[in-house]
């Protein structure tokens, strides 16, 4: 009787293990197929370029003023030299503050534009995985190897759920 119970438990365990379903998809590829994602990344890139141009302009001004001060240092009064050095310090602080604030605003804009898309994608993945009975789904963009014979690519199913091609 004891052997029969052990055999039964072993059979149930093996049956349960063989019935498990695994899914995978490339999340980056999925994002790129969503038109709103492209639009959001274009907006973020445009803002990033604006900030980079402004920062480059400020750094150019700093470099120009530094060169000018170095060239005139021997011919100007101590008071004027000190005044220009103070201006350079203030400009340096402004550059640093601008850089920090620009990065924070860029991150906020990125989150504002992309978070709804990320949430929508995550919800679609969960819906498809639950509907199809997958026990877990792997992002194949993060994996070194995926045995495609033992798991299912759910990218087409998730795209259909999202209504994208």
Label each residue range with its predicted role.
Residues 1-22:
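Bacterial Sec-dependent N-terminal signal peptides
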Residues 20-165:
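Amphipathic, charged alpha-helical segments and their helix-to-coil junctions
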């Amino acid at each position: 009787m004891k052997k029969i119970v052990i055999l039964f438990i072993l059979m149930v365990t093996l049956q349960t293990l063989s019935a498990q379903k695994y899914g995978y998809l490339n999340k980056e590829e999925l994002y790129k197929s969503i038109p709103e994602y492209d639009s959001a990344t274009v907006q973020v890139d445009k803002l990033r370029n604006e900030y980079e141009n402004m920062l480059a302009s400020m750094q150019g001004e700093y470099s120009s003023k530094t060169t000018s001060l170095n060239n005139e240092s021997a011919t100007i009064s101590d008071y004027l030299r000190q005044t220009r050095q103070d201006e350079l310090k203030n400009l340096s602080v402004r550059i640093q503050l601008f850089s920090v604030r620009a990065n924070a605003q860029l991150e906020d804009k990125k989150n504002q534009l992309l978070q709804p898309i990320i949430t929508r994608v995550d919800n679609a993945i969960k819906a498809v995985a639950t509907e199809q009975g997958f026990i877990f789904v792997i992002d194949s963009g993060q994996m070194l190897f995926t045995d495609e014979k033992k798991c299912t690519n759910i990218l087409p199913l998730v795209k259909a759920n999202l209504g994208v091609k």
